[in-house]
């Protein structure tokens, strides 16, 4: 028995490597062999000797006490008992010491032949089926054909029992007695033993050479891919030279994990609870021992083979029970948990124990509001504090000499004697606590507070801290943690104190914004009322105004004039006569710092956020906190003074409601009449009805809003709550006193988009709903609650993936020195600005110098931060776009650099080295994800679609410019002549008549009617174009007669007739017969073809066969999907889809080149579209005929233009327009989803995630590098490898050289030396060629793929697919350098960010004297050297 070495791992390691375990290593780490399946003796409850819990192998069960009891107590430490062989030591060694089981026959490791990719199979070139047949003793495999090679038997051939016996019969007699090494001997075996022989005889270098040759020269793509797959496995073994041998994938010795990690616990009633692993180990041992016996008694081969197979299966179950088809089950039919299962999943070792540990010194309780707390304080119940600070109190008790021993001090604390409260007060000063509310969605979910002792049992929380925690006081609970060490206390105070975290890291806006009551109070006090008492008085200063108010001479809302301090235009504080203000506003301004000026506005939640922002900028965080406490107190006080509750009478129903509803009903009747007469289709009727009610509803809302706003000069309580932003939304008020409106229809699960019920709910909540109305609306309410529950999980999972992909992005250097950047412009949608240039460049770093275009003044130098003032200056200048540094173009090798990241939004200063920007980005994106999903049910399933806007109207006086416009002339319903647009790419630009600046650009849809011409100068409000919002149309461009082709009833079209109207409609359906393609030809009178139009699936044909049509007539209407109620339920999956870089379900076909369109033939239900560029390059695309084709013959398209309807896939954008375009696309698309919900998140967070998605490249041509074709490698690694071979030479012919072989890569210098030596001896010199670098293509990975592809295997394994990741890592002999957060948390190290940065580890802080002494010495040395 090989004895183990003492291996104590130091905790200051800097990397972890993983590899296959060799049998020698397993023995080295083992403390002895487990020979018996027994666990413990049923009578004595002591472990059996040589069993699974044996004390001799694993160590004693009790501290310092051997099995037989001969040696007890610590003084015998280290002695091995002579009677029972147990070493006397502490019992915790039973958590560390391993044992082993020596198997009689080798078995294959299930990870390497059962999981895909099949490693052993790839190495040997055997398919999984055949490999299974060998491993499970069903077939023999030929290991060495020997003399049988002539009979056509080759290595790796599989033989059945009969074939094997036949061969043995025909073998020459002496063949069996030859040595195994003799090449003539025939050898065939079965089981893992055979695999072992095959693997150990592999020549990896030769195999690698052969496969490389195959991969580069094979004509068949399939064989080429096969070769590349095998090559990857071969290369992994070659790369981890010596550390991994292929034959180690076959297990000869099974390690047994320490007994404490698979415990056996006695329950009451004489039964035991045991870990599943013990069962699995027991089966292995029993089968192994039985096999030993069978071999000893020379049992027949059949029996042995069966037993060997059972042993293989037992070991399989032990390693990975979930992978087997017939998993081992318990009596209760539950599969046993194997070693792999204990690592996997949420309950596995990684996520349960290594990444989520429980913490001592913690408490939890319900929270209540603490309105009199200051910022950064919280109230902790007395009893809780005494328990939390116990060790500190004990220490103080002993220090003060009140007690002598710790034990008696404990008693005093437990009895809560009065003396401890005084000590507790003292101990708590300057010792903050951390408060945490679950779910902790972002870093503000844990903050530090200075505790105050309070009576009661609930924790008091500062009301302004609620937003960050997303807490309310309806029974939420919070956990308290106590930082113990001095470092921890310091970090809590400096970095985590609530008063220091008043900005939201997601967008830089203040997060400590008063809400609800406070806002209402401030709004009320700053509101003006005409005709109030004391109106028009003038006061010489705030004091006088307050005296007048207190004496009751002037009302708090009265409009008065006061002399106050305000800022002049240079920003100096001066006295100003403020007209039109009120006493309330004076009171508020007493709290506002003078540096901000005088606020003479009404305060709502929105304006309050800006005010707080300004205060922080003007006077810094410390004084901003005082200001916040001031307005908190004032707000609460005024909400109470104003008595701002509302009653039923405050909910006003506008008189106009009846009129509007009547109008709506009349319009709907008219629509029904049109339908019954057959003027419109059922679909159009439905759309128009929905449209009518949507309009009625929005008109009613406007009137209602005006009514309530004018009630009591706007002092209506309901209106004040709404207008101040304290509570409620326009939607809710509309439902209370307008009408509930349209509701969504109950939908089957998985159906796309909600339909809308066309009968609206005309009542509101004040009038009360009828039974039917109530029933309709319950659906929405319930759906909301169900969605919430389901979506929370999705949002949480999104956050987890985001963190996993970006946790290693840390600011690692000041400046990476890149010259690249992103061009940033204001984001516009048509002509409304979504994000201004100011917002997008603020806090970023400029790439180049920015100079004012007219004055030539330098605004900001390259490499400098764009501050608020600079951004404003750029915004005001005519500059349209700015090139800024971005993490997308950062060239740091690890993490990103400070200049590319820009400003840290949580502190408004440039980001510091060591900031964990990746995790912050992930939290900023994930946190609102949960919020968004929780926001569905408030509208109660109300159909939230706006009335379709289907026209272009001039918003200013401007000149029109059309581009790519193709039209035909026709007449509209009124018989007026109009032009109809028939080009797909038409755009109209509105140009300012005076300056020539483009005001806005609009896309003019196909089928629009034009009411203006190119170059017209139009007035504001003029209609330019309008189109049918409900139907996409196909319009004929030629005049002639219709001729249908392949339009066959019930094959390519179906007829829908309407019972109500008796109207028949032809609707094109998808045909089973792909040769039949429905189309409409336009022919002349004499039958010559002019144009052909395809009829897309789902189109309603509105012309008859043989009908005469003129240019501009509609042939087909394709109903647009309308009435889809938008919900973030669509939003969250969209975000996931973008971050996972998934292709949409119906992708558009996109042109890859600029060129002209020609329509080709129809092939198998696809229409061929040919794009020919000006250079003569031709690309052909096949578009499914069920799709609508967006281009027409002779159109000129740009690269990236969609040819058919559908979404463009990110992969297409990357391939056609390049990486920058796809990065911008993903960032903007995700931003759109969040913007729709009114969530502001800074672009840089999305950029970090997208950067992580674009880390990898795929090798196209490996050249002379070590890469393989199609291999996916890190961009950084790729560049380094190319740099490595740059300028080197590859030997083509080694000539007479002894040192160099063909194919070897050498430096030019080595080559020169070698050749000059050969020349001197008149020998043939070496011939070389230049080394060829690899080429690659940038790829876009989804966040899951990117997280699994990280360089750290520990991070990947703790994320998903644990076994697969570890499996790959082991074969590659990977080394984890512990650069990210997760790896370090798993190892129990400080994270390499913030105060845990690695360079801080080596810093030694000495005393001031020492420093002075060193300086003095240095000065002496310098002086001395000068003298010399």
Curated annotation (Swiss-Prot):
Described function: DNA-dependent RNA polymerase catalyzes the transcription of DNA into RNA using the four ribonucleoside triphosphates as substrates.
Native source species: Phocaeicola vulgatus (strain ATCC 8482 / DSM 1447 / JCM 5826 / CCUG 4940 / NBRC 14291 / NCTC 11154)
Pfam families found in the cross-reference section: RNA_pol_Rpb1_1 (PF04997), RNA_pol_Rpb1_2 (PF00623), RNA_pol_Rpb1_3 (PF04983), RNA_pol_Rpb1_4 (PF05000), RNA_pol_Rpb1_5 (PF04998)
Protein name: DNA-directed RNA polymerase subunit beta'
GO function terms (MF aspect): DNA binding; DNA-directed RNA polymerase activity; magnesium ion binding; zinc ion binding
GO cellular component terms attached to this protein's record: DNA-directed RNA polymerase complex
Reactions the enzyme catalyzes: RNA(n) + a ribonucleoside 5'-triphosphate = RNA(n+1) + diphosphate
Cofactor requirement: Mg(2+); Zn(2+)
SUBUNIT field: The RNAP catalytic core consists of 2 alpha, 1 beta, 1 beta' and 1 omega subunit. When a sigma factor is associated with the core the holoenzyme is formed, which can initiate transcription.
PANTHER family for this protein: DNA-DIRECTED RNA POLYMERASE, DNA-DIRECTED RNA POLYMERASE SUBUNIT BETA
Cofactor binding, per record: Binds 1 Mg(2+) ion per subunit.
């Amino acid at each position: 028995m090989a004895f183990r070495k003492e291996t104590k791992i130091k905790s200051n390691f800097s990397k972890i490597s993983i590899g296959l375990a060799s049998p020698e290593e397993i023995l080295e780490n083992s403390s002895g062999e487990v020979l018996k399946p027994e666990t413990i003796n049923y009578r004595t409850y002591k472990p059996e000797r040589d069993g699974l819990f044996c004390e001799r192998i694993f160590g004693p069960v009790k501290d310092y006490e051997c099995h037989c009891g001969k040696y007890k107590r610590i003084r015998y430490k280290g002695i091995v008992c002579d009677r029972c062989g147990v070493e006397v030591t502490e019992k915790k060694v039973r958590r560390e010491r391993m044992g082993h089981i020596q198997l009689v026959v080798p078995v294959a490791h299930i990870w390497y032949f059962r999981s895909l990719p099949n490693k052993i199979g790839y190495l040997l070139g055997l398919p999984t089926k055949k490999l299974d047949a060998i491993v499970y003793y069903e077939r023999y495999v030929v290991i060495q054909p020997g003399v049988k090679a002539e009979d056509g038997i080759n290595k790796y051939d599989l033989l059945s029992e009969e074939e094997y016996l036949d061969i043995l019969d025909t073998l020459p007699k002496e063949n069996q007695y030859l040595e195994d090494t003799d090449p003539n001997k025939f050898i065939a075996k079965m089981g893992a033993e055979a695999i072992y022989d095959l693997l150990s005889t592999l020549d990896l270098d030769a195999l690698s050479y052969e496969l490389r040759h195959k991969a580069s020269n094979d004509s068949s793509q399939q064989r080429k891919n096969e070769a590349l797959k095998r090559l990857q496995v071969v290369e992994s073994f070659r790369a981890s030279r010596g550390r991994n041998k292929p034959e180690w994938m076959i297990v000869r010795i099974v390690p047994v994990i320490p007994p404490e990690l698979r415990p056996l616990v006695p329950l009451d009633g004489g039964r035991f609870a045991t870990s599943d692993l013990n069962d699995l180990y027991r089966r292995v041992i029993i089968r192994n021992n039985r096999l030993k016996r069978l071999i000893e008694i020379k049992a027949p081969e059949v029996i042995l083979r069966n037993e060997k197979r059972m042993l293989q299966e037992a070991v399989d179950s032990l390693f990975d029970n979930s992978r087997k088809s017939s998993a081992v089950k318990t009596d209760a039919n539950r599969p046993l948990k194997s070693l792999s299962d204990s690592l996997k999943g949420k309950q596995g070792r990684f996520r349960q124990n290594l990444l989520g540990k429980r913490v001592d010194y913690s408490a939890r309780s319900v929270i209540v509001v603490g309105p009199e707390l200051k910022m950064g304080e919280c109230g902790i119940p007395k009893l809780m504090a005494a328990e939390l600070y116990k060790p500190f109190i004990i220490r103080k008790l002993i220090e003060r000499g009140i007690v002598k021993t710790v034990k008696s001090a404990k008693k005093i604390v437990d009895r809560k004697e009065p003396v401890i409260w005084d000590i507790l007060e003292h101990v708590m000063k300057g010792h903050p606590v951390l408060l945490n509310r679950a779910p902790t969605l972002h870093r503000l979910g844990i903050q530090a507070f200075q505790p105050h002792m309070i009576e009661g049992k609930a924790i008091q929380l500062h009301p302004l801290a609620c937003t960050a925690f997303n807490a309310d006081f309806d029974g939420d609970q919070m956990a308290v943690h106590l930082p113990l060490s001095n470092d921890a206390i310091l970090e809590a105070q400096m970095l985590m104190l609530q008063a220091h975290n008043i900005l939201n890291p997601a967008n830089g806006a203040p997060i400590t914004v008063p809400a609800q009551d406070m806002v209402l109070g401030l709004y009320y006090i700053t509101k003006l009322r005409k005709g109030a008492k004391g109106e028009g008085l003038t006061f010489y200063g705030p004091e006088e105004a307050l005296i007048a108010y207190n004496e009751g001479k002037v009302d708090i809302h009265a409009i008065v004039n006061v002399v106050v301090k305000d800022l002049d235009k240079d920003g100096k504080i001066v006295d100003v006569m403020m007209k039109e203000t009120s006493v309330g506003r004076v009171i508020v301004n007493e709290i506002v710092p003078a540096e901000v000026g005088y606020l003479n506005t009404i305060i709502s939640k929105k304006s309050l956020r800006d005010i707080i922002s300004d205060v922080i900028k003007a006077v810094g965080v410390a004084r901003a906190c005082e200001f916040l406490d001031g307005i908190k107190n004032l707000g609460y006080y005024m909400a109470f003074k104003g008595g701002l509750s509302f009653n039923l009478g405050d909910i006003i129903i506008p008189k106009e409601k009846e009129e509007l509803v009547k109008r709506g009903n009349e319009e709907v009747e008219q629509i029904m009449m049109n339908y019954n007469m057959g003027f419109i289709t059922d679909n159009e009727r439905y759309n128009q009805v929905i449209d009518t009610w949507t309009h009625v509803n929005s008109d009613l809302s406007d009137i209602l809003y005006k009514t309530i706003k004018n009630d009591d000069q706007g002092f209506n309580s309901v209106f004040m709550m709404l207008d101040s932003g304290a509570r409620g939304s326009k939607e809710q008020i509309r439902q209370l006193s307008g009408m509930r409106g349209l509701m969504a229809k109950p939908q089957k699960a998985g159906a796309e988009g909600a339909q809308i019920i066309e009968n609206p709910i005309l009542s509101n909540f004040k009038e009360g709903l009828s039974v039917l109305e109530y029933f309709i609306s319950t659906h929405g309410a319930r759906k909301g609650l169900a969605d919430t529950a389901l979506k929370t999980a999705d949002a949480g999972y999104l956050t987890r993936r985001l963190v996993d992909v970006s946790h290693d992005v840390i600011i690692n250097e000041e400046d990476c020195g890149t010259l690249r950047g992103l061009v940033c412009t204001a984001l516009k949608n048509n002509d409304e600005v979504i994000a201004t240039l100011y917002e997008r460049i603020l806090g970023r770093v400029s790439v180049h110098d920015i100079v004012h275009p007219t004055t030539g003044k330098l605004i900001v130098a390259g490499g400098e931060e764009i501050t608020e003032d600079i951004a404003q200056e750029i915004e005001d200048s005519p500059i349209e776009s700015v090139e800024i540094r971005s993490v997308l173009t950062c060239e740091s090798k690890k993490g990103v650099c400070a200049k590319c990241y820009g400003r840290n939004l949580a502190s408004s200063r440039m980001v510091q080295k060591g900031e964990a920007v990746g995790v912050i980005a992930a939290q900023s994106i994930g946190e609102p994800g949960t919020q968004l999903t929780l926001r569905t049910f408030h509208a109660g399933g109300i159909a939230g679609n706006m009335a379709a806007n289907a026209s272009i109207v001039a918003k200013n006086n401007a000149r029109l410019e059309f581009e790519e416009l193709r039209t035909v002339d026709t007449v509209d319903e009124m018989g007026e002549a109009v032009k109809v647009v028939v080009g797909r790419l038409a755009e109209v630009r509105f140009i300012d008549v005076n300056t020539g600046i483009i005001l806005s650009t609009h896309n003019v849809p196909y089928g629009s009617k034009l009411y203006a011409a190119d170059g017209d100068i139009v007035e504001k409000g003029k209609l330019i174009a309008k189109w049918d919002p409900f139907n996409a149309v196909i319009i004929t461009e030629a005049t002639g007669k219709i001729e249908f082709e392949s339009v066959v009833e019930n094959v390519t079209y179906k007829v829908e007739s309407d019972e109500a109207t008796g109207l028949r409609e032809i609707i094109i359906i998808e045909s089973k017969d792909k040769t039949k393609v429905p189309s409409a030809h336009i022919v002349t009178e004499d039958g010559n073809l002019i144009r052909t139009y395809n009829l897309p699936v789902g189109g309603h044909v509105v012309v008859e066969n043989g009908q005469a049509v003129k240019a501009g007539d509609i042939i087909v209407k394709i109903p647009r999907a309308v009435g889809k109620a938008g919900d973030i339920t669509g939003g969250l999956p969209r975000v996931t889809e973008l971050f996972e870089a998934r292709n949409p379900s119906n992708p558009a076909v996109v042109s890859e080149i600029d060129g002209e369109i020609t329509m080709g033939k129809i092939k198998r239900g696809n229409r061929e579209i040919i794009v020919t560029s000006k250079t003569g390059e031709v690309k052909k695309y096949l578009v499914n005929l069920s799709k609508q084709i967006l281009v027409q013959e002779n159109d000129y398209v740009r690269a990236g233009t969609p040819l058919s309807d559908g979404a463009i896939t990110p992969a297409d954008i990357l391939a056609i327009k390049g990486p920058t375009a796809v990065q911008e696309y993903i960032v903007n698309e995700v931003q759109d989803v969040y913007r729709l919900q009114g969530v502001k998140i800074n672009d840089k967070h999305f950029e970090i995630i997208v950067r992580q998605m674009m880390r990898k490249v795929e090798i196209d041509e490996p050249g002379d590098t070590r890469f393989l074709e199609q291999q996916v490698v890190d961009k950084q690694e790729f560049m380094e490898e190319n740099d490595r071979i740059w300028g080197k030479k590859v030997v083509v012919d080694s000539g007479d050289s002894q040192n160099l072989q063909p194919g070897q890569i050498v430096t030019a210098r080595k080559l020169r030396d070698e050749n000059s030596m050969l020349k001197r001896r008149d020998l043939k010199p070496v011939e070389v060629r230049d080394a060829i670098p690899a080429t690659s293509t940038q790829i876009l990975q989804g966040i899951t793929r990117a997280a699994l592809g990280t360089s750290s295997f520990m991070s990947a394994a703790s994320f998903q697919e644990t076994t697969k990741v570890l499996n790959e890592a082991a074969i590659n002999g990977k080394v984890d350098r512990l650069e990210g957060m997760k790896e370090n948390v798993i190892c129990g190290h400080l994270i390499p960010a913030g105060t845990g940065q690695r360079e801080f580890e080596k810093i030694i802080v000495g005393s001031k004297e020492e420093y002075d002494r060193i300086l003095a010495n240095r000065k002496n040395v310098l002086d001395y050297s000068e003298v010399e």
